[in-house]
Amino acid sequence: MSAAPLVRAVRWYQRVLSPRKPAPTCRFSPTCSEYAAQALDRHGALKGGWLALWRVLRCNPLVPGGFDPVPEHFPARHPRPQGSPPTDHPPTDQPS
């Protein structure tokens, strides 16, 4: 499946619906819609769509937001925002 129709849908949202919102609501940079368009362009409909969905799910008050660009390469595991701290788990070769 080509990503072009999905990118057009995102651009339509940006032109028509987004300006009608009373205030900017995205906590990330680039915005979730721009991230979606970039992810679809870079990674195609399936992988780019997955990245876009994962980003929208993270755009909520429980996540601090910030700068989160589209990864250059599709991650093997779920994407984590760049610059986010690593988990608190100690290395496996050391006792906890």
UniProtKB/Swiss-Prot annotation:
Disordered: annotated span: 68-96
Biased composition annotated in UniProt, kind: Pro residues: 82-96
Localization annotation: Cell membrane
Topological relation to the membrane, as annotated: Peripheral membrane protein
Record flagged with keyword Membrane: yes
GO cellular component: plasma membrane
InterPro entries per UniProt: Membr_insert_effic_factor_YidD
Pfam family membership, one: YidD
Alphabetized UniProt keyword annotations: Cell membrane, Membrane
Broad class of the protein's primary localization: membrane
NCBIfam families noted in UniProt: membrane protein insertion efficiency factor YidD (TIGR00278)
Role summary: Could be involved in insertion of integral membrane proteins into the membrane.
Family of this protein: Belongs to the UPF0161 family.
Protein name (Swiss-Prot/TrEMBL): Putative membrane protein insertion efficiency factor
